[in-house]
Amino acid sequence: MAKGRHRRIESRRRRVTKRALVSGSVVLVILSTVMVVAYKKLEGNINTVSTEALGDRPTAVKVEGPKAPLNVLVMGSDTRDGANGKGIGGSTPGLSDTTMLLHLSADRSRAYGVSLPRDAMVNRPTCPSKSKSGPVPGGLTMWNSAYAVGGPLCTVKTFESLTNIRVDHFVVVDFVGFRSMVNALGGVKICVPEPVDDDIGHIKLPAGTYKVNGQQALDYVRVRHGIGAPTGDIGRMKRQQAFIAAMIQKVMSAGTLANPARLFSFLDAATKSLTTDEAFADLKQLA
């Protein structure tokens, strides 16, 4: 009888183990399917632009190893009309008021950013027009006009002609999308070191620490008036860099990474706001 009981127990164990393996396999298949669908959706959100029109470019630096460091030119597109211009008045023809070169290390563990002043006077090369109406003659002009006349390709071409540094990829972030990204995270905590009282941008903040929503964040990173030194575009660049660092910290926090719904909502908002070169639209490039 003992042997029979033992065989029955072993039989039940095998059935339980088999059911657990089958259930685990089903869950794994479902999770894999969800991940593939989510990946495809995020990748499909991104708009792309071909870089063929750039013509002659600086030579890419060759490095040993499976991965190379990347230079990514990040532009913030600000038309300031419609939903993008809420609360600021006026409109612009689509300037890039924010431009930053990000250098990603080969192992992708570090990133270094350098902001480019939008009001800097530069010699812009001849560029294909954004409206595809023919080439736009170059000349001495403000940095952010390159985006207005020729979009991201003219901005890349201008940067490369000035620095002889090859831009491996570019990313354009729409400011409306920026607002959605912050809201998807449930807000971002920032430190305001001195009072902000900007009648043009309609933003007033005493000095202190705040958790800002998307619209408040957008107003804050746009501010160029009504704030103590450093003022103007240089001060704004520093605030933008500090805010981006705070947003990245929120994305990488346990509260976001351990919350699949919040993480996907952020990634969905982020990818919907992006325009990149065709190669960079493959999300695996960031891995």
Model-predicted regions and their roles:
Residues A2-A287:
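Non-catalytic, solvent-exposed segments at the cell envelope interface
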